[in-house]
């Protein structure tokens, strides 16, 4: 456990950020999962709507620093490719 005042503050900030980042990452995974369900059911209209939402959430997650921007680009590219194949 941290002893110095600044180290205690850092530990507190890290915990708050960890919780926030986990929430963002979970939201991203849930949106991707819903898109994959739409792809599996072969409903193109639903998949396109959910792709738009997924791209938005993935880009936001990357801009917040939760995931790397290249990882975000790769996820978007792969999801777009699957939706376009419908």
UniProtKB/Swiss-Prot annotation:
Belongs to the bacterial ribosomal protein bS20 family. InterPro entries: Ribosomal_bS20 (IPR002583), Ribosomal_bS20_sf (IPR036510). Residues 1-11 have a biased composition (Basic residues). The keyword RNA-binding applies. PANTHER family: 30S RIBOSOMAL PROTEIN S20, SMALL RIBOSOMAL SUBUNIT PROTEIN BS20C. The keyword RNA-binding applies. This is Small ribosomal subunit protein bS20. GO terms for molecular function: small ribosomal subunit rRNA binding; structural constituent of ribosome. It holds the Pfam family Ribosomal_S20p. Signal peptide: none annotated. GO terms for biological process: translation. Keywords: Ribonucleoprotein, Ribosomal protein, RNA-binding, rRNA-binding. GO terms for cellular component: cytosol; small ribosomal subunit. Residues 1-27 are annotated as: Disordered. Binds directly to 16S ribosomal RNA. It comes from Syntrophobacter fumaroxidans (strain DSM 10017 / MPOB). Gene3D superfamilies: Ribosomal protein S20.
